[in-house]
């Protein structure tokens, strides 16, 4: 059973943009629900946030959740600046946790044929991922399962967007493992 908390991050299905023709205000509904129901398993305190698990006093992992939707115009210019400051401040703070993860909906690096690497996200977050000790960078969006190691970057990049829609065509490269033949998801278990 998946009787555990679910920490959400915003992506294209959470914004009501004309490109995707989804309900306007859908993201705010999710944020409001999480705020009004703090004891539920749905955890979504803001568009970007940090959580240390299992607790802040003795964490095993620090998770920095970001909103990569800025590249599609979903964030205001001021929000983009605020998020950049937040990310840099969280990295500067450090943590007692042996693991630090970055989570965002869109992959920075991807072996999908139609999409590939996201140059805007790489420009925005790439320097921090090269300089700081981030263990894993998680993303979804691309309908594949990927585990990539990119030269010059410290974290492993995990793409897990194979939740049920049509799987994307991928190329095979030296950067890592790609599976576009079956659906799946990630369930992580960290130990000291």
What are these regions (language model features)?
Residues 1-99, 115-120, 124-136, 144-190:
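Extended active-site neighborhood of metal-dependent phosphoesterases/phosphodiesterases
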Residues 110-114:
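Gram-negative outer-membrane beta-barrel proteins
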Residues 103-109, 137-145:
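Histidine-centered catalytic micro-motifs
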């Amino acid at each position: 059973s998946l009787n555990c908390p679910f920490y959400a991050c915003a992506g294209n299905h959470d914004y009501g943009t004309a490109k995707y023709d989804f309900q306007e205000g859908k993201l705010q509904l999710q944020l409001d629900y999480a705020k009004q129901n703090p004891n539920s398993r749905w955890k979504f305190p803001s568009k970007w946030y940090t959580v240390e698990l299992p607790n802040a006093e003795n964490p095993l992992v620090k998770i920095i959740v970001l909103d990569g939707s800025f590249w599609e115009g979903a964030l205001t210019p001021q929000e983009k600046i605020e998020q950049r400051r937040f990310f840099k401040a969280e990295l500067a703070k450090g943590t007692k946790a042996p693991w630090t993860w970055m989570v965002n909906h869109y992959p920075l690096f991807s072996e999908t044929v139609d999409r590939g690497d996201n140059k805007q996200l790489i420009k925005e977050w790439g320097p921090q991922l090269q300089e700081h000790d981030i263990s894993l960078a998680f993303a979804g969006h691309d309908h594949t399962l990927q585990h990539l190691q990119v030269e010059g970057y410290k974290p492993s990049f995990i793409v897990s967007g194979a939740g049920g829609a049509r799987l994307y065509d991928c190329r095979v490269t030296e950067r890592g493992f790609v599976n576009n033949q079956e659906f799946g998801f990630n369930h992580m278990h960290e130990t000291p």
